[in-house]
Curated annotation (Swiss-Prot):
Belongs to the glycosyl hydrolase 13 family. GlgB subfamily. Keywords: Cytoplasm, Glycogen biosynthesis, Glycosyltransferase, Transferase. GO terms for biological process: glycogen biosynthetic process. Its main location: cytoplasm. One of its GO terms (molecular function) is cation binding. The gene is be1. This is 1,4-alpha-glucan-branching enzyme. (1,4-alpha-D-glucosyl)n binds at W88, K123. InterPro entries: A-amylase/branching_C, Branching_enzy, Glyco_hydro_13_cat_dom, Glyco_hydro_13_N, Glyco_hydro_b, Glycoside_hydrolase_SF, Ig-like_fold, Ig_E-set. It comes from Emericella nidulans (strain FGSC A4 / ATCC 38163 / CBS 112.46 / NRRL 194 / M139).
Length: 684
């Protein structure tokens, strides 16, 4: 942001003059965020203090062992703290209320020891205005546990381990990567066994695998506590509790710290777009009213997700959500967030039954939820002020302009957005088109169709495509032959040959052309067979598909290891040449007849031959920089399960003659269904 940029939030218009007709709407949006920042400054002493709500609310223990517990519940007319410590006596520990509906109780220590034992059950009980006595899990609780032998309903526990049992972080956060290469993972499925895997197993088994593959970021799903395992973590009950299914809070801290020791940043998949509608172990109807943290009536219900919608324009809701982000950064050492369901937060229609044409009126009209936009801008402003290296990623299908520009320019402040159109394109191609009918121009357009100056994370597939009812790319490509012909002892059938070739090419073209970051969902890097289906009534609570068969890459008689090694080579080559943080590619050729795509990015020359049957000898390719080129990545390499049709030692010499708008050309042999990345010899 330059010093000459306007300070009224209209700087984005200088970057994109097509936004000029919406100047007033942009300025109004900016002013609304500024008014909230001013309110927080005046009333709360600034975003720093405001986002530390967990130091005031919930349970806090002093150095001397005194406990203070506070809860916002304005609809309650009585409140008391109950638990194992007082035999659930509703009269033993009454709470007092202030003028803002905040209930409080102080419990002095006995002989320097907290009166509530560590890991013992607690709840708040309230009497509502209708006279009903209710029991609730504290909203800011840091640990809840579930015993399915007793009930599916979670129980809240007072978590205050002795100092000797607390995890002490040993390693500093790594610097924010210039090129973000994300490995998306779910702790519970990270094992070939038919059970829930643990934080400790992830630390021991998955972190070395992710590091070996060359990723520099991990995105952890389903960490915020959720009662329904099959929700994939997207129906959150307890926002400050790390899921107890996988182990203790200390185990998650060890996971993050160990990742940091390996140079890996860790992002939390944060769900602030909605909340579980559970009453007994969630936030819903917390104080007996339907409008405490959420909008009342139908406005507070998400009809597709069957969940509750936050009221982002409420002061205490903002405190709760901003403090939640801060808590995960401070308590667990996360390095940033992937915000789930951002489209639902940005619009009052929540994206339901609404397509986006890309017309700017859709982003600045009456359908925009001003409070949702304000909260996201405030969240990004707080995070980036306090943690300059914090990484935020938005999951938005609408394509809202300025989502990934700073608030000062009039943006919402995210670092990256997910390129959600890319995986949809691949599924459409594989479902509906024969290989001869692939539209190379449309492929290139979809991969490069992103807003200038706003960073995008490209991916060929994520967890969405792995879920039951959908198929991973490898399943679309190979189908039932995955079960019979992925052994090197069986015939290399045309189906498997095509599947492996396109699996590598699709990933490489996405990585090289599609964005400023790259994401892969665990297992998909090696073509994991089958889909994901969590234990539920519809499958007899089976874990058979709720696991990742990561052992498949360790069997040298299976072809999965070739895809795994290719993925590693792709990440390591990016690490060396840095195309993800280089300017967008220059595309010099999109040949529909030959099915050839050629482009340059980060001083590498990329050549893709998607033709299903034709190989080309001495194919002339334009290139800007003169010199001698060598192969740095070849999808047909035998090390990656290819046919090895290209001599890796070949030197390609440029000719000083313009070709396809480039100053020079060179000639290459490009076999069918093969992609090459060439680099100048002196960079090897």
């Amino acid at each position: 942001m330059t010093s000459t940029a306007p300070s009224d939030g209209t700087g984005i218009i200088d970057l994109d003059p097509w936004l000029e007709p919406f100047r007033e709407a942009i300025k109004r949006r900016f002013d609304y965020v500024e008014s909230w920042i001013k309110t927080v400054d005046e009333v709360e002493g600034g975003l720093d203090k405001f986002s530390k709500g967990y130091e005031k609310f919930g349970f806090n223990v002093s150095e001397t062992g005194d406990i203070t517990y506070r809860e916002w519940a304005p609809n309650a007319i009585e409140a008391a703290l109950v638990g194992d410590f007082n035999n659930w006596d509703t009269k033993a520990n009454p709470m007092t209320r202030d003028n803002f509906g905040v209930w409080e109780i102080a419990l002095p220590a006995k002989n320097g020891t907290p009166v509530i034992p560590h890991d013992s059950k607690v709840k708040i009980t309230m009497v509502t205005r209708s006279g009903e006595r209710i029991y609730r899990i504290p909203a800011w609780i840091k640990r809840v546990v579930q015993d399915l032998n007793v009930s599916p309903i979670y129980e809240s526990v007072f978590w205050n381990p002795p100092k000797a049992e607390r995890y002490n972080f040993q390693h500093a956060r790594p610097k924010k990567p210039e090129s973000l290469r994300i490995y998306e993972a779910h702790v519970g499925i990270s094992s070939p066994d038919t059970r829930v895997a643990t934080y400790k197993e992830f630390t021991a088994n998955m972190l070395p695998r992710i590091k070996y593959l060359g990723y520099n970021a991990i995105q952890l799903m389903a960490i915020m506590e959720h009662a329904y395992y099959a929700s994939f973590g997207y129906q959150v009950n307890n926002f400050f509790a790390a899921s107890s299914r996988y182990g203790k809070p200390e185990d998650l801290k060890e996971l993050v710290d160990t990742a940091h020791s390996m140079g890996l940043v860790v992002l939390l998949d944060v769900v602030h777009s909605h909340a579980s509608k559970n009453v007994d172990d969630g936030l819903n109807m917390f104080d007996g009213s339907d409008h405490l943290y959420f909008h009342s009536g139908s406005k507070g219900q998400h009809e597709l997700w069957d969940s509750r919608l936050f009221n982002y324009g409420n002061h205490e809701v903002l405190r709760f959500l901003l403090s939640n982000l801060r808590f995960w950064m401070e308590e667990y050492g996360f390095d940033g967030f992937r915000f789930d369901g951002v489209t639902s937060m940005l619009y009052t229609h929540h994206g339901i039954g609404t397509g986006f044409s890309g017309g700017y009126h859709e982003y600045f009209g009456p359908a925009v939820d001003d409070d949702g936009v304000m909260y996201l801008a405030l969240a990004n402003e707080m995070l980036h002020r306090l943690y300059p290296d914090c990484i935020t990623v938005a999951e938005d299908v609408s394509g809202m302009p300025a989502l990934c520009l700073p608030h000062g320019l009039g943006g919402v402040g995210f670092d990256y957005r997910l390129a959600m159109a890319i995986p949809d394109m691949y599924i459409k191609l594989l479902k509906e088109k024969s290989d001869n009918d692939w539209d190379i121009g449309n492929l290139a357009f979809t991969l490069t169709n992103r807003r200038h100056g706003e960073k995008t994370i490209a991916y060929a597939e994520s967890h969405d495509q792995a879920l039951v009812g959908d198929k991973s790319l490898m399943m679309w490509l190979c189908d039932k032959e995955m079960y019979t012909h992925m052994s090197v002892l069986t015939e290399f059938t045309p189906v498997i040959e095509r599947g492996m070739a396109l699996h590598k090419m699709i990933r490489l073209v996405t990585h090289a052309l599609g964005g400023e970051g790259y994401l892969n969902f665990e297992g998909n890097e090696f073509g994991h067979p089958e889909w994901l289906d969590f234990p539920r009534a519809g499958n007899n609570n089976s874990f058979w598909y709720a696991r990742r068969q990561l052992n498949l890459t360790e069997d040298h008689l299976l072809r999965y290891r070739f895809l795994n090694e290719f993925d590693r080579a792709m990440q390591l080559t990016e690490s060396k040449y840095g195309w993800l943080h280089a300017p967008q590619a220059y595309i010099s050729l999109k040949h529909e007849g030959d099915k050839v795509l050629v482009f340059e990015r980060a001083d590498l020359l990329w050549i893709f031959n998607f033709h299903p049957t034709e190989s080309f000898t001495d194919y002339r390719v334009g290139v800007e920089q003169a010199g001698t080129y060598r192969v740095v990545l070849d999808t047909d390499d035998q090390a990656f399960g290819g046919l090895g049709r290209i001599d890796q030692g070949t030197r390609f010499f440029t000719t000083d003659m313009e070709w396809n708008g480039r100053r020079n050309y060179l000639q290459v042999y490009i076999p069918t269904r093969t992609a090459l990345a060439l680099a100048l010899e002196e960079t090897l």
